[in-house]
């Protein structure tokens, strides 16, 4: 948020923000609200593909505003500028790293909001010639640290638990680490833990969590640059840009 504010300020714009809590109805309301108060342009950050509804697309078109989307998936048919995070390549990097470290029974834990990453995880495992054990795919309603803790406890209750767990984001990885420590297990000797997003806190937990780092600062800089150009030149060609994440190896693998 602070970076977005700084990038916009450098272009002579102020930031008005509305949180949507990853809910489709809240996102739709945000689009309609911003349209009513006559903002100059819209930067829409979407975390789940389920939010990309026909109703939302219609609302964005009706607004008549220059719009930049930041998504986790490529939408080639949309008529808006878009930057998408190449989560596919990031998750493949993560699975490859765990495989190279010798881990074979790799679990994946997620909440219901991050299911797109679970789908990519399964694809990455198959691409690497590794078996996807349905018992090792744990998805539940709880989010963040509590979700990571509870899903890891479920994995530990299995007769044949995993030797590594891929967490769909870093907060879940923090919860997973707590569950493993509570059970007296060593990280990464007994079980490795990998996160996703590279939150600031991830470098301070358990000597540092191995994670996939999304280029958020570059993403915001490019998004603001394109969006502010669009406000001055509405007829410029549509921009579709993919940014790749990086693997950050730390202590938990």
Could you describe each region identified by the protein language model?
Residues 151-253:
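Flexible loop/turn connectors
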Residues 81-108, 119, 123, 145-154, ...:
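Hydrophobic alpha-helical segments within soluble ligand-binding/sensing domains
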Residues 8-20, 107-108, 122-146:
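Short beta-strand elements in bilobed, periplasmic/extracellular small-molecule ligand-binding domains
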Residues 1-96, 100:
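Alpha-helical recognition/docking segments in bacterial nutrient-uptake
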Residues 19, 46, 71, 84, ...:
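Short beta-strand/turn micro-motifs composed of small residues
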Residues 92-128, 135, 239-252:
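An alpha-beta-alpha
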Residues 8-11, 63, 126-132, 157-161, ...:
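Short helix-capping segments at alpha-helix termini
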Residues 38-47, 66-68, 107-110, 138, ...:
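Periplasmic-binding protein-like
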